Amino acid sequence: MKVLEVKTLLSEATDRAKEYKELRTQMVNLRKALKSVADLGDSEFSGKGASNIKAFYHDHVGVTDQWIDYIDMKIAFFNSIAGAAEDKGLSDAYIEESFLEHELANAHKKSKSIMSEQKKAMKDILNDIDNILPLDLFSTETFNDELADANDKRKKTLEKLDALDEDLKTEYALSEPNEQFIKSDFQKLQEATGKGKNATPIHYNAKAYRESDIHKKKGDIEKRTEAYLKIKKEEAKEREIEKLKERLKNYDYADADEFYEMAKTIGYENLTAEQQRYFTQIENTRELEAGFKGVAVGLYDSGKDAVVGLWDMVTDPGGTVEAITGAVAHPIKTYEAISAAIEESYQKDMVNGDTYSRARWVSYAVGTVVTSIVGTKGVGAVSKTGTATKVTTKVKTAASKSATAQKAITVSKQTIDHIKQKVNKGIEVSKKHVKTKLNQIGDLTLADILPYHPRHDLVPAGVPYNAVNGVTLKEGLQKFAKVILPKPYGTSSSGRRTPAPVVPPVTVKYGEHYARWSRKKVLKPNIIYKTKEGYTYTTDNYGRITSVKADLQLGEAKRNQYAQSHAGKPQDRKPDDDGGHLIATQFKGSGQFDNIVPMNSQINRSGGRWYEMEQEWAKALKEEPPQKVNVNIKAIYKGDSLRPDKFIVKFRIGDADFEKVTIKNQSGG
């Protein structure tokens, strides 16, 4: 007999998950301890049997990894029980199978029987008095329907109970192969350690263990585990999405941050058209909001231009700099956000807008573009705001094909004066006032910088929007946005490159990852770029390559002798350095600056540690069939040097465990 008390079940599941989490922490600590011995260098631990001992600890690390995977499966299982019960509609149920199968089933039959007997008895009575007072017999249709529904619910509840029970038992058993494998695999490891007096790590036979039939099944077990954990993660996300979608149905959009987080979890494609539009507005401004705080005053003081003109136009058209002032924390993101916001506002107010919105959009766009609100030095280069004559000329040109429009423009001096007044009001602010406002950024909320915030009560400006080429205006705004980007680097008094602000990296297209500094081609700061081979590089705020991730391919790429001979010059390259490729050209690695760093010639050339490591990778790729080689290279720098101090390389060949190699950028590595 089954009894389901969900409250107790969930309480027990929570406790078990907590216990497994504590066990996992212990396993992680054990793994760290084992790995610290396995990774000891020759200078720290060498001599007779040292390699065997380190291999012994290394393979124990693999066993702890298996235990951690097993524990993760258990945690995922116990954490999913609440969702499984909710999916069956049993989230707060108390069910006794015996009661449903017997007492309630019997009650159903008895109720039908009683009603049938009562109806028969009543029919006999009515027949007896029919000649005196004819009456219709009462209908049992409603009763029968309700009784049938109740019985159907009883049966479905039993089915749900059985299904939940079977699902949980089946899923719980999925981790049993892991447990059996771990025990058998560990047994083989013990056997490889020796027997009797020789059963010590110094006699450990790593080859015997790693080539055992049991250990070779490790890859299959890992794939099963990975697939299970992926499914559990997707299930949890789907349940959360359904809950959030239900919440958003009647959401009042009052809290932009809360809406954004919910919508991001749900996924853009699962939002309604209205929700997608609101989400896009938040997305276009959210990433810059963090940059407004903290870095704003510092950037202004160091000579960077304040974001006033174009950013103010996009996020708060018709408003003033008193409402929003910021600074360029990340040039690439600044342009992307501004450009996207321009596109959003164009689609919203020109393509899909009404008379009011089109007039407002064109009036501000014309005023912005024609009066050169954005200069070439930076967003804040707005000392000259243009004249009404320029506005008139531009609008006349746009409307030259329309006599009606021409007439409308001729009489729109009041409109142009209105535009000029609005523009001037937003620009003629002293540096002292801008700095004061930057210090007040702490009070800024995300809602304040959304396009067309409702607090701005703008009247239709009267610009003849029907005679203006909106697409041209939009493209003009976006072009102006692109030229505002400040130079990514400065130059110190000693001639060294000064860094950009430290911000999260952004992804750029390959080919758009270069910048200029002191007339030299350099990499942009804080970016991620990917080659056509799929090799992914990341730079820091100095524009130095800090990491490369790649699934290597055999092939040949062109070398660039100039790039190799100039890497790290003039200050940081050493006399015995080469221009070393992080990904060798034999693996289709780029021959340009985007893959080259100053590297000690001894480690880079034949016989060196870097060279030998590359040969190992090439050998694996040349096998039949070729093995997969995955590499993760990190370049570690000191101070502002453009020359790596050392390299930390993790690589895996085929299904083997990752190997970690540290190579110092010096002779001998």
Swiss-Prot record:
Subcellular location: Cell membrane; Membrane raft
One Gene Ontology molecular-function label: DNA binding
Keywords: Cell membrane, DNA-binding, Hydrolase, Membrane, Nuclease, Toxin
Temperature dependence per UniProt: Optimum temperature is 37 degrees Celsius for the C-terminal fragment DNase.
pH dependence: Optimum pH is 5.5 for the C-terminal fragment DNase.
Biased composition (Basic and acidic residues): 569-580
Alphabetical list of PROSITE patterns matching this protein: LXG (PS51756)
Protein name per the record: Toxin YeeF
Subunit and partners: The C-terminal fragment is a homodimer. The C-terminus interacts with cognate immunity protein YezG, probably with 2:2 stoichiometry. The second YezG molecules binds with lower affinity.
Highest taxon above the source species: Bacteria
